[in-house]
Amino acid sequence: MKVGELNVSEKIKEILRERGIEELYPPQAEALTSGVLEGENLLVAIPTASGKTLIAEIAIANKLLEEGGKAVYIVPLKALAEEKFREFKDWERLGLKVAMATGDYDSKDEWLGKYDIIIATAEKFDSLLRHGSSWIRDVKMLVIDEIHLIGSRDRGATLEFIITQMLGRAQIIGLSATIGNPEELAEWLNAKLIRSDWRPVKLRKGVFYQGFVFWEDGGSERYNSWEELVYDAVKKGKGALVFVNMRRKAEKTALELAKKVKNYLDRKELRELRELAESLEENPTNEKLAKALLSGVAFHHAGLGRDERVLVEDNFRKGLIKVVVATPTLSAGINTPAFRVIIRDTWRYSEFGMERIPVLEVQQMMGRAGRPRYDEVGEAIIVSTTEEPSLVIDHYIKGKPEKLFSQLSNESILRSQILALIATFGYSEFKEIYDFLERTFYAHQGKDPYMLEEKIRRIIYFLLENEFIEVTLEDEIKPLPLGVRTTKLYIDPMTAKIFKDTLPRIEKNPNPLGIFHMISLAPDLTPLSYSKRETSMLEDEYYSLMDRLYFELDYENERKFFRAFKTALVLNAWINEVPEGEIVERFNVEPGDIYRIVETAEWLIYSLGEIAKVLEASQEVVDYVNTLRLRVKHGIREELIPLMELPMVGRKRARALYNAGFKDLESIRNAKPSELLRIEGIGAKIVEGIFKYLGKEVKITERPRKGTLDYFLNP
């Protein structure tokens, strides 16, 4: 179908043509003539890289230009939100303003009312629904990217609640990978179903086993090892993406592959890769990444910092990085296709031991093979060490993806959502709550209504017993202040209960380690894991620091206790300005883990302060908690807090300023620019920015530092 045949405004067609799109892919054409442009709900279940996003973009632009209002585009990851935000900016030329909303769950974000297209994570949009943001009534379209995540143990229930809230209020488009039961999902959504196996790049699939690749079509090719598949791709001037099941394995495999990949690079590439490697901040994980980068190889996992992940993704897309070894996090929607995808592991560790990776996930990884506009064919190869190729082909290549099942039985999320129905949406009777849940995917799948009823009763009793709600003499359910604040803070009521129960102990003995340990035991924070080798260190630390903790060692839940304790130790080191590299080495963690727990800890400590206010804790405790939140946010000791206001000043520069005698904003305002320039890490641009912030305009010509080549040439 030609773009000119689309039943949309000429302005939309013009944007598409400027992108070089003259003709739509068959699934796109089918979707856009299904009734979606006339307002019908739509579920698109097609392979990766088949143009799902463009279907949504055209439908959104058409809807908003014709009817006005707003569209919300839900994504599973912040990184994906940033990617979509960049893609959607094209539509601003038609007057459709685009915004992105991810963090800060305790805000109405009324500023979003000025925008037409809002890209948000599921959790962020759920929190906006709870806050009753006024602009939500103007939402005419809701797009759920990666809607198959409704079957995810962790996040599926949140997605299900959002959709249930919006069904009937807005047009809904679901974008999905190929799933096992799309008809059932489409029926629940009251949506037209577009299902297709069509791909813009042909995909050749096979299994590597005992020195041969056995292709799905019956052919075979000889390779000495699976690594030869990587080297062969690089020799052909193409890229390879290798999926493994563990972070450590990703790092080790990348460094092994790097030894040989380097031989296939030219001088220009080696020079650019050296510049990339030198741009990384120093820490043990980045040292390994830099070593691999020098040879055109990288690893990618959740333990990398955000900047490092973006650097790897961008340079792999550009073709400078030839090989990426990744954990499956990279298959979760980020746009990083490669000519050849090699799936090294089809088993992974879970809390229940080793488990087979689902067909849906493996097929998503395989879908990363083949780059539109660059490759005529992509190759996806599963490595098997023990299983016969025919069995792997039957299970993963020819097998159907698993069916999606509602995760509403996840009691933690159900607890939070039932409180939200009462405290935010005004549900005041058991029957109203039950009727709402009857509209969910859970109920649509015919799950046991008696079991659901029992869960609702148990949760309401928990909320009543812990003073989140009350039941009036007329049998009406009413929210209490603790319940209202808990749901607005977007925390699990169980977390709020832990805060409430622990506050008297905090009043008596306020200290960071105790608070960090408490929040790490709460369900809203996933604590760090620890190895057997670390057990004796953690036990020794515990016995020397136990007087600071609010919880005693519970031998029945020893592992949970020590995971929380290790997390508390890392946070304690962070606020005492221990360098990031030292934290990584001392506690056997990755930079990405530090950023994750710091971000979550800041939110939970803020929530603790808010719960303390509701429960009328002493002002001293509220102030103490708020100060601790700032220390966690910036990774600093208390005396540096005033300096963190300054632009371009992080924990290192703030400490350098303080140690040089500039302990507050007034002392900096009265300083000479030359005095600040003498401080390590403070350059002309930073000094200009600081003085501008303090209301003083200065212009500095930066002189070269002593001991540099520039100083030698221009003293």
UniProtKB/Swiss-Prot annotation:
Domain Helicase C-terminal: 226-422
A Pfam family matched in the record: HHH_5
Residues where ATP binds: 28, 46-53
InterPro entries membership: DEAD/DEAH_box_helicase_dom, Hel308-like_dom4, Hel308_SKI2-like, Helicase_ATP-bd, Helicase_C-like, Helicase_Hel308, Hlx-hairpin-Hlx_DNA-bd_motif, P-loop_NTPase
EC number(s) reported in the record: 5.6.2.4
Catalytic activity: Couples ATP hydrolysis with the unwinding of duplex DNA by translocating in the 3'-5' direction; ATP + H2O = ADP + phosphate + H(+)
Record carries keyword DNA damage: yes
Complex and partners: Monomer.
The protein's name: ATP-dependent DNA helicase Hel308
